[in-house]
C-alpha cells in the first residue's frame, strides 16, 4: 500500500480542532487526475457539505492540465466525495446539530487512486491559536537547547 502525498492542508490544523478523520475517494475527470499527478492542487479554504445524502467538496482548486484541450476541467468545480452511507449520515448529523465542519486534511494517491482525508473539525478561538503557538515555541526552544547541550 504505497501512498504518494499530493498536498497538505496545514491551515486546517491551525484553524480547527480535528475530532475524527475519514478516508474518502473522489469523482474526478481525466485531466484532473493528470494535474494531481504533477502536484497542482490547493486545499486551502476548501470544505465539504452534505446535500441529499451525498457529500461534496467545495473550493478544492485543481489547476487545469497544461496539455489539455478544450475538454479541460473547471479548476474550482464541486467534486463528489465517495463515502459509506453511515459515514455520510454521521457527518451530516454532526454538522447539523453540534456545529462541526468537515475540512479536507490531505490529498494523496493510494494504490493508483486519488484519496482525500477529511476531518470532522470544530473551529478554534483566537486564544486557542495563541496557546498552540506558545506551546510550539516552547517545544522549539527546548529542542534548540538540547541540541546546543549535546554539542
From Swiss-Prot:
Keyword Magnesium annotated: no
Keyword RNA-binding carried by entry: yes
CDD domains in the record: SmpB
GO cellular component terms, A-Z: cytosol
Keywords: Cytoplasm, RNA-binding
Disulphide-bonded residues: none
Location (main, coarse): cytoplasm
A GO molecular-function descriptor: RNA binding
Similarity field: Belongs to the SmpB family.
Name the UniProt record assigns to this protein: SsrA-binding protein
Organism: Geotalea uraniireducens (strain Rf4)
Gene: smpB
Amino acid at each position: 500500500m504505497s501512498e504518494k502525498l499530493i498536498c497538505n492542508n496545514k491551515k486546517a490544523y491551525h484553524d480547527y480542532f480535528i475530532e475524527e478523520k475519514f478516508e474518502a475517494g473522489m469523482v474526478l475527470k481525466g485531466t484532473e487526475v493528470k494535474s494531481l499527478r504533477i502536484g497542482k492542487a490547493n486545499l486551502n479554504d476548501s470544505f465539504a457539505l452534505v446535500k441529499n445524502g451525498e457529500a461534496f467538496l467545495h473550493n478544492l482548486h485543481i489547476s487545469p492540465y497544461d496539455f489539455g484541450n478544450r475538454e479541460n476541467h473547471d479548476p474550482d468545480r464541486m467534486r463528489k466525495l465517495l463515502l459509506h452511507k453511515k459515514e455520510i449520515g454521521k457527518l451530516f448529523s454532526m454538522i447539523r446539530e453540534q456545529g462541526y465542519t468537515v475540512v479536507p486534511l490531505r490529498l494523496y494517491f493510494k494504490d493508483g487512486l486519488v484519496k482525500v482525508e477529511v476531518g470532522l473539525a470544530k473551529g478554534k478561538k483566537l486564544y486557542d491559536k495563541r496557546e498552540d503557538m506558545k506551546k510550539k515555541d516552547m517545544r522549539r526552544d527546548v529542542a534548540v537547547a538540547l541540541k546546543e547541550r549535546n554539542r
